[in-house]
């Protein structure tokens, strides 16, 4: 029954999706501001030279002047880039855990909160790359050993002074229950960055993001980085499964991406317990839905990312063996013809 419902929900988008999935992509440069400054300085030197006649000394002076201005422009460009990046709060390696103060808490839905933690200095950035995460650590008074859990911040990597986390409260989840009990002013230990999948612009022509619940956070980190970079022309397809409509996290942000980049970003939502008015997928993510909306495995430079609860991994891609071992590819993606190299499990 769900298979028919899911496909029926996807049909109005199918022809649009296939058109969007086959459009060409192109790359671009990234140091435009720096090069523009350099060109302007060189142009100023050329103007000076052309208005000084044939005097050799003046020609030599003009060359020196142009060189000095070019160096100045490069220096200014570098300082702007470095200033934009800022100092990193998390540097990895032997840094160890850092204690951060909770600045604010916002209720998102019935079981999820947004936590904003202050970085040690107001002009610092997190230091996270795409895609990477942070470890959190907490040890209660009666705990024999600390609880350590990974989280992917939803704040932009360029944001200064804070990080944001979306945390869903799970029954008997030591870390999530502790965080949901925290109030502003309290502190939590963090360590990172923990590298996941190193992303670079146009690394793949098309990526698919298959997420369940709070498994959406690394997917959002990746999608945001792609669309924040004008040089990155990667196409993105999101399949996001949840229990109820209220559980769909970051939906407004994904709708903004879909409205801004309709030829490059599409999102498909699946609910286990949908309302009567729901027109999207119903039940669980299945083979028929993925075959309809995902990019073809043999015709494009594609990568499929999976992040969600254990049941989703088992059905879609097979489980990871450990954080450093992706395990064998299994499940629906293998049945659809994707190779192990085409799939990454967060």
Swiss-Prot record:
Subcellular location(s) of the protein: Mitochondrion outer membrane
EC class of the enzyme, as a word: oxidoreductase
Cofactor: FAD
Location of the FAD-binding FR-type domain: 95-200
Tagged with keyword NAD: yes
PROSITE patterns the UniProt entry points to: FAD_FR
Membrane topology note: Single-pass membrane protein
Keyword NAD set for record: yes
Catalytic reaction(s) noted: 2 Fe(III)-[cytochrome b5] + NADH = 2 Fe(II)-[cytochrome b5] + NAD(+) + H(+)
Domain of life: Eukaryota
Binding positions for FAD per the UniProt entry: 203-238
Enzyme Commission code(s) on record: 1.6.2.2
Record family assignment: Belongs to the flavoprotein pyridine nucleotide cytochrome reductase family.
Name of the protein described by the UniProt record: NADH-cytochrome b5 reductase 2
